[in-house]
Amino acid sequence: MTLRRLFAATTLALAATAIAGCSGAPSEDDDASAGSNQAATIARPPQFVILAFDGSYNLPFWRESRAFAASNNLKFTYFISGVYFIPNAAKAGYVGPRNGAGKSAIGWGGTAAEIAERYEEVRLAAAAGHEIASHANGHFDGSSWSESDWNSEFDQFDKIMFEGVGVRAPRLGFGARDVVGFRAPQLGHSPGLFRTLPNKSYAYDTSKSDAANYWPEKNNGVWNFPLARLRIVGSNKATLSMDYNFYVADSRGEPNAANKETYKKQMIDTYMAYFQANYFGNRAPLHIGHHFSKWNGGAYWEAMQAFAKRVCGQPEVKCGTYKDLVKFVEENKDKRRELQAGSFTQLPRPPGAASSALEDVPESEIAGTAEDHAAHDDNEANE
């Protein structure tokens, strides 16, 4: 049975359960005998599916992604890069830690007019309920940075976004204190980062990776929301739940649009296996990270859209922002052990559905090194 047919059958079964119980969602009483063998000690949590983007350069992609979200009742989290809000002519106004003034691994924002449009896209996204989070500035690998380096990077991000460098920043409808999430460029984190984040009032970080069924933990006052380590269905290659890593695993980070449909199907199938394992298992949040790039002919952006359409309207699924997830885990932080163990009445797992314990892929096998990752965002507009 294909994943498409399997999930369609599952959806029909859940709908039948809901109708039988005169409810809009499956009830725990209805499926108590068919679900988990864990003792039910807490209420079944929603299945969070977090869909996020790194980058923010490509203006048409801003509009396309917002339109898709509006049509499909979901919210994105946008991790934005500060240098895309600095005009080319003002690049000396940014001093990257250990790199010096006027240096960026991903280029700059273009003209003042282009930057004004980009600020407006940020404002519109926030006004529509999407979350704006930080991807730092120059897209440098910070894995060796000190606390002082990170402090400088965060301070410059706030100045760029809310005061302006080379242009005057407009009012965005939110302020620096409303930016509470971070993903390190190249996922390059260091001990200095995790000392800096709580001091800057950040609530969560998404720079690490972990098993697909991991429930978030709070470390040093900051929630850990890691990307998942997965096997690509169809090739068995290792990847993170991020489009760039699929791109490297599929075609070594080189364009190969001729195989677009294969890559698209494999990503959909992989994300569906990730979803099914958790949805019918311990309900650990799904973390999916993409970029404003249409690599391999748009295979990965199309796959993300197809996946979102398939799951975001399902019972007990919440395709929200990381801020939504923060609220839930804060309210349930004393239940983290039970959530990780799946100590609630789980939905019956259909025959053929992905296992509740996907293989924990060794991080050393993941395709996409920091060096490969360094320049990928610079080509957002052209991929």
Regions found by a protein language model. Give the residues of each.
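Bacterial N-terminal signal peptides that target proteins for export
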Residues: 1-11
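C-terminal motif of bacterial Sec signal peptides marking the signal peptidase cleavage site
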Residues: 19-21
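Bacterial signal peptide processing site
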Residues: 23-25
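Post-signal peptide N-terminal segment of mature Sec-exported envelope proteins
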Residues: 30-42
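Active-site beta->alpha N-cap acidic-glycine motif
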Residues: 39-131, 138-141, 160-194, 211, ...
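C-terminal domain-boundary segment and adjacent tail
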Residues: 40-41, 204-216, 269-383
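Active-site-adjacent pocket scaffolds in enzyme catalytic domains
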Residues: 95-105, 109-111, 170-180, 184-282, ...
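An active-site-proximal "capping" alpha-helix that borders the catalytic cofactor pocket
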Residues: 150-164
